[in-house]
Amino acid sequence: MAKKRNTSELFVEQFAALALARKDHEPAWLLALRQDALDVFQATGLPDRKTEAWKYTNLNKLSKTGFVPAQPLREIDSIPAPILPVDGYRIVFFNGRFQPALSLLQSLPEGVIIESLGTAITREPALLESQMSHRIPSRDMPLSALNSAFSEDGLYLRIAP
């Protein structure tokens, strides 16, 4: 009879495959941050109903599904116009990814930068390392740790002092 693997083992296997693919295009500090976050998750696993903060949340389906990486983006040319006029900025995400071409970011105030986190890491690696490298989720936040380990990108917002 085959041994049933626990959820943490499944995520660790999936992480190893992604880490191998990322090693050539991510800085070492980010790979280490991801590994540290996975270690936090691995030490605690998915919370269950015995965990006070999660007693009303059943994560059994997540434990059976495992992690499925987001598919590459398909190109989209436009988004529906807002019902009311927008006098301001618009940040568009499609399938969890920042879409600068569809966002309205013209005439940002001086000193304000909005871009994808991946672009910022490439453009300002030392700054991002200093801001991110010590941000490991605590053991009481296993889903935050799992998110940190597997995240693909994000939004970078910098407002100069």
Question: What do the PLM-derived regions correspond to, one by one?
Answer:
Residues 1-161:
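Glycine-rich and polybasic anion-binding loops at the starts of cofactor/ligand-binding domains
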